[in-house]
């Protein structure tokens, strides 16, 4: 119960925090009040992997009777998380660390309660749509009138573009060129376990084009010969063979990916030599009658 000012923090703050922790604080204030959080400037957790806080992170959630909204998930040490005011009189803070030790100070969050009629500051609005920041890219600052962009809506928007340049033009028409240049700038801060060599410039447009161009291509499938040939009175060796069949997530990354299925434009029949067995007595004098090398046809 929040009745005044206080704080929560990672263990041993501002010294290195322990490994393998999962801590949760649920703050509850009086009716018609809200809870305000402010992070200490000594904020430092394990760095993100590919700009996603996978390993060590602190997460803040708004709690109401009908829903739970993630206001943000933070890690790394470059930026201190913003001041947050809850939308209701309940808020949840979660801290997680994995089994990898890092020499970081952790976090300390100061909390207090405010009267419900006080509006949230513009800098606090819509933080539920942000999980981690990408260094070097200047995002449009949210305002009180900006609508919240959900992950599903953002995913649909990204699916409409084929290049990074067009995507950045859509998000930031005025600063897209600067954003594109900053996107590939190397940063000297600590990178974490998955980063060992100097960051190289990745061709995101080529990766996106390859996924769309080659997702639905022939690939090896293992088929059971008795099931494939619909034969129940014989047995084959080998029991299964590899065939080339069309498959894959053909529309991944496009707006119509759920309605897209891979289908072959052309099929060919190929012969395969296998050993066929027929049921019966396998005495030496009758063995030749029960088995034979045969050619079978399979669709590729």
Swiss-Prot record:
Name the UniProt key words of this record, in alphabetical order: Cleavage on pair of basic residues, Developmental protein, Disulfide bond, Glycoprotein, Growth factor, Mitogen, Secreted
**Which Gene3D superfamilies does the UniProt record give?**
Cystine-knot cytokines, Spermadhesin, CUB domain
Main subcellular localization, coarse class?
secreted
List the cysteine pairs that form cystine. 53-75
Tell me which residues make up the CUB domain.
1-114
Please provide an example of a Pfam family that matches this protein in its UniProt record: CUB
Q: Where is this site: Cleavage?
A: 191-194
Q: Which SMART domains match?
A: CUB
Glycosylated residue positions: 220
Sorted alphabetically, the Gene Ontology BP terms of this entry are:
platelet-derived growth factor receptor signaling pathway; positive regulation of cell division; positive regulation of cell migration; positive regulation of cell population proliferation; positive regulation of ERK1 and ERK2 cascade; positive regulation of phosphatidylinositol 3-kinase/protein kinase B signal transduction
Signal peptide residues are: none
CDD domains recorded:
CUB, PDGF
Compartments in which it is found: Secreted
Q: Can you provide one Gene Ontology molecular function annotated for this UniProt record? A: growth factor activity
- Reproduce the UniProt comment on modification after translation: Activated by proteolytic cleavage. Proteolytic removal of the N-terminal CUB domain releasing the core domain is necessary for unmasking the receptor-binding epitopes of the core domain. Cleavage after Arg-191 or Arg-193 by urokinase plasminogen activator gives rise to the active form.
Naming one, the record's GO cellular component terms include: membrane
- Please give the subunit comment from the record: Homodimer; disulfide-linked. Interacts with PDGFRB homodimers, and with heterodimers formed by PDGFRA and PDGFRB.
Q: What does this protein do?
A: Growth factor that plays an essential role in the regulation of embryonic development, cell proliferation, cell migration, survival and chemotaxis. Potent mitogen for cells of mesenchymal origin. Plays an important role in wound healing. Induces macrophage recruitment, increased interstitial pressure, and blood vessel maturation during angiogenesis. Can initiate events that lead to a mesangial proliferative glomerulonephritis, including influx of monocytes and macrophages and production of extracellular matrix.
Similarity comment text for this entry: Belongs to the PDGF/VEGF growth factor family.
Q: Protein name, please?
A: Platelet-derived growth factor D
